Amino acid sequence: MDARSPDLTTDAAGWRTDVPTTKSLAEVNASVALPTAGVWWRRLLAFVGPGYLVSVGYMDPGNWATDLAGGSKFGYTLLSVILLSNLMAILLQSLAARLGIVTDRDLAQACRATYSPAVNFLLWLACEAAIIACDLAEVIGTAIALKLLFGIPLIGGALIAALDAFLLLLLMNRGFRFLEAFVIALLAVIAVCFAVQIVAAAPPVAEVLHGFMPKSEIFTNPEMLYIAIGIIGATVMPHNLYLHSSIVQTRAYERNETGRREAIKWATTDSTIALMLALFINAAILVVAAATFHKSGHSDVAEIGQAFELLSPLLGLGIASTLFAIALLASGLNSTVTATLAGQIVMEGFLDLRLPSWARRLLTRGIAIIPVIIVTAIYGERGTADLLVFSQVVLSMQLPFAVIPLVRFVSDRRKMGKFAISPYVAAIAWIVAGVIVVLNLKLLADTLLG
């Protein structure tokens, strides 16, 4: 999988000499100015944004389905799995940010400058499949939200979802900071919606805190283990690693050792705080499911539409179901923005092929909408639930192809110099990568074998 073949020459850092260096997302690269002086929090605020764009992928409809299933069936027990998967995500996203800041390459560009053309083409195909699978989940989530809120049939909602292809174009024309503000505002809407539902559900605090402690029964109960693997598989998104390694470069930090060191510090802080928000939202979905469905004996709630119908009656709060659907719609809109960006980064990085963002969006979403319309027409809403699970399986299959190159690059002192991660951190990263790969392979095998 290396570029170490007779016909491919590399420089001292191990990058292929026949691959030109281009800026990642050139139209917004280094476009966000940083304060040259002042108190530390002003520097931090200037870096706030990329982490929140990344966090969007950690609360898409695939996460909702696994969190609902875990909470309704097993109460608060699987909160520890959500915490563990979030800690894994924090580590991997910090490594992605480090790679982008130090090498001035996103993960796709780093792969292209290291591996042979054949390997890069296969990696690109795998990543495109993952992005389309992610888009599939967004189409389903948006269509379900539109049906729950406005009574629009699922097929109509899926077609309406195609129109958001122009949302990113509109936001990018206003500047990258405007796009970040839009995403953060929708994340705030999601957080408020679930905060209200948690207050209404009034879960016992002691039981919730106890749920964050790992339990041996997670490994001894096959059904619980299956859902736990699903939670981890739905949490760590491969396209987020490509996305984060690129968008951290939108900051105009000094491209020298001092500037890069400070950028790594603030970018890691930004993504860690943002992913803690994702932890809250994922935990909130599970807690609401546990306090509402599990407590009342509804232990088989795994579908979003089913949860919507039961929430208000069980909570005794008329607006609860509406808040749930609003949060789902906000999640779908946010995921649209980040998946489009990730698609652009991957296509430009691996192939050096540049398409207008609206054309890129229409292509990806057009491919994703076809199976949604066919399955909905034949099998109805139940079919979309199965399709949602399938999209998570496809994402799981691609994950190793993003995680392994990332850990390998940031461990390489030739490529990273002084910024290469320590052997201790590298060991943890490889363990995390190994755990994710093994768990996702098990999830894939269990799903295919029924």
UniProtKB/Swiss-Prot annotation:
The coiled-coil regions, if any, are: none
Give the residue spans that cross the bilayer.
44-64, 77-97, 121-141, 152-172, 181-201, 218-238, 273-293, 310-330, 366-386, 387-407, 419-439
What processes in GO biological process is this protein linked to?
cellular response to iron ion; iron ion transmembrane transport; manganese ion transport
Indicate where this protein resides in the cell: Cell inner membrane
Of the GO CC terms on this record, one is: plasma membrane
- Presence of keyword Glycoprotein: no
Alphabetical UniProt keywords = Cell inner membrane, Cell membrane, Ion transport, Membrane, Symport, Transmembrane, Transmembrane helix, Transport
User: What terms describe the molecular function in GO for this protein?
Assistant: cadmium ion transmembrane transporter activity; manganese ion transmembrane transporter activity; metal ion binding; symporter activity
Q: Which domain of life is it from?
A: Bacteria
Give yes or no: UniProt keyword Transcription: no
* Chief place of localization: membrane
Q: How does it sit in the membrane?
A: Multi-pass membrane protein
What does the sequence similarity comment in the record state about its family?
Answer: Belongs to the NRAMP family.
- PANTHER family membership: NATURAL RESISTANCE-ASSOCIATED MACROPHAGE PROTEIN 2, SOLUTE CARRIER PROTEIN FAMILY 11 MEMBER
Q: What does this protein do?
A: H(+)-stimulated, divalent metal cation uptake system.
Q: Write down what this protein is called.
A: Divalent metal cation transporter MntH
Organism annotation: Bradyrhizobium diazoefficiens (strain JCM 10833 / BCRC 13528 / IAM 13628 / NBRC 14792 / USDA 110)
Its lineage reads:
Bacteria, Pseudomonadati, Pseudomonadota, Alphaproteobacteria, Hyphomicrobiales
